[in-house]
Amino acid sequence: MSLLNVDKNEVEDTLYELLVGQSDVEKTIVKDVVENVDLIPSNVNLSGAEIELVGIDNKEYILKEITDKIKNNYDYIIIDCPPSLNMLTINALTAATSVLVPIQCEYYALEGLSQLIHTIDLVKDRLNNDLEIEGVVFTMYDARTNLSLQVVENVKENLQQNIYKTIIPRNVRLAEAPSYGQPITLYDPRSTGAEAYRLLAEEVINREVE
């Protein structure tokens, strides 16, 4: 949320309240945090939702029920998942129609990717038949290091899924943007990071219309 200049400590209703049934989705949405972008905020309380959901029937579908109420109001609903494969991530995968998988160009990237793809396959088989892997995007890429080059090569050799041509580089301006409460396309629209994300957005949209 820091990317969108929303103070997570000041919002009254968040995704946590939605998941545990203490708020309404329309009340929780923060309108136009950036032009044409709405947000359902979250904060540290979200980590407690996992415990709150224990014992609830069909708890895997709670987020889907929420997004189904608003999906006709938007061109895209983007669910930003935690890196851990917990019940919140399962909820996101059950609610989604497709998954964009970011891979940091680091040593354990391939191992983590294999586990995620296995989880996605299980969710598709048991909870959400419509779920597809939209594509894989490399992030934190540094062309000066052999490690980045090796990760990209290994993933391409071992992965049958679509891989986006656009690669997100390691970029100082990208790292700075959250502290200024802005997405990179506003903070420094001419930076290599901003240009990479624009190209990725175009690639995602173009795949949708093909």
Give residue ranges: language-model regions.
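P-loop NTP-binding core
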Residues: 1-210
